[in-house]
Amino acid sequence: MGRRLKRDVFPAHLVGNVVDRRSRSRGNEGRGPVSRRHRLLAAVALLAACDTSPSSDDAFLTRAERTDYRETSSYADVVDFLQRAAATSPSVHYTTYGYTTEGRALPLAVVGDIDDPSPASVRASGKTVVYLQGNIHAGEVCGKEALQMLLRDLMAGRHSRWRESMVLLVAPIYNADGNERVTLTNRGRQHGPFGGMGQRPNAQGYDLNRDHMKIESPEARSVARLFTEYDPHVAVDLHTTNGTQHAYHLTYSPPLHPNTPPAIDAFLRDGLLPHVTGEIRDKHGWEYYYYGNAFARGGGEPAWYTFDHRPRFNNNYIGLRNRIAILSEAYSYATFEERVLATLYFVEEILDYVHEHGDEVRRIVADADAASVVGESLALRAVPERSAEPVDILMGATVEEAHPLTGRPLLLRADTQYVEAMYEYGTFAPTLLERVPQAYLIPADLGDILTRLAAHGITLEPAEPTPVDIEAFQIDSVSTAARPFQGRNEQTLFGSYKPTQVTPAPGDMWARADQPLGRLLFSLLEPRSDDGFANWGFLAEQLEIGGTYPIVRIPGG
């Protein structure tokens, strides 16, 4: 637990510094920064009466702000910022939620009217819990800076009503090891920070945003434990994107897996995301839209394609945990300052909406947890699905600049935009369905699988040595990728289920699908799942052509 004073305090003149820096954001003249200035000046008047003096003029400026956005925060910067925030404000608590490959503790600020930062205290509050994550790719640093700025605003008394309904879990630096591997050439054409940024993978060489299902990294296991113990209702994952030269300052995505609970998809697509987009446009004059890149496939016309439905990705994984997840992708070719502000504005509007709709958020999550998926036909594989009609996409342009230190070419967003109508591939349609069983039987000798299931928070129970009618998957063939990905050669199994009977052996465990994580369990254990344990090769030694998949199941009707 962090040290706390008796009341929230924040140096008044530092709030003024923040106003001046934000007012320079290009394209915002007379809009967002003006209203933001008025709000912060009101905070100045309030905080000027506080009896605490700042230790320095830069006490709560981020490294990005102190260096005029030439640099980004180090791991030590972030830890120090969060610890000092906890020492200054009674509503900010400092803790950690795990470790990196190289042993760095993963810092977490827990913000709200709670007694301490423990999962028990947070869950006992009965409030909506929101997890905010930055820096899963350590070259994409805008979220790391924006979350520190958000904390500072909360300390200054802004958004005080959020504490009535929410507890925030703020994790600015998830890929902490990658963050410390700074070079001037990481993310080559990204426009700043010119002083360098970290690398995409962690210290093991893993892309942490592909590790949520196989959880081979300590970081992925740490965040899975956080999801299980704190059980946030909403999660926001903050990135920077590049690719297509569009005119959006930020693009976003809900969970994309077809097995995402429909109520979560509707809440985001029909409610939160359109509302937030409109608020950003009205307040700041910037356009946001669904994540995508414009390109042509097979010689056809260009279309707007989202990324991938598989739950190895953070927001898709969280959707299969029955939670509301949002991906944020600030535009790489905007200036570093604009990317940070675009991310900050996005998070603020999300939190405003969640605050106003807290009862609905908690009900959607509770209903998804209570609903059994046993007997449902869920997707094992999927393909992008074309929109019924073309949509208007705002395209843009860039100008090339030279990196001031290396001379390498950089791209800078130009203040131009035009509309191009194209089909959108923003959702996914199942290509292979399977009925969810009642339960899976995992043999005792598959200890690694049992350990990984437990790491995800899946509930397991001992199997009694009583004969039971089951289905076993008979393997017709196995296709193995020639090249490794994430250190593993992915595998595709072909075959079909056959009825038979087994008697569980000592140590065998049941994983029942009638549990809140039933959707996730299904994707992890089904042999033909495109992102399950079989896909990642964890069962390769047990697979034989003509043999059976070692994990059997009780059919779901």
Model-derived regions: residue spans:
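Structured catalytic-domain cores with a bias toward divalent-metal coordination
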Residues: 16, 36-38, 50-557
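Serine residues within intrinsically disordered or low-complexity segments
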Residues: 23-25, 35
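Sec-dependent N-terminal signal peptides
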Residues: 40-47
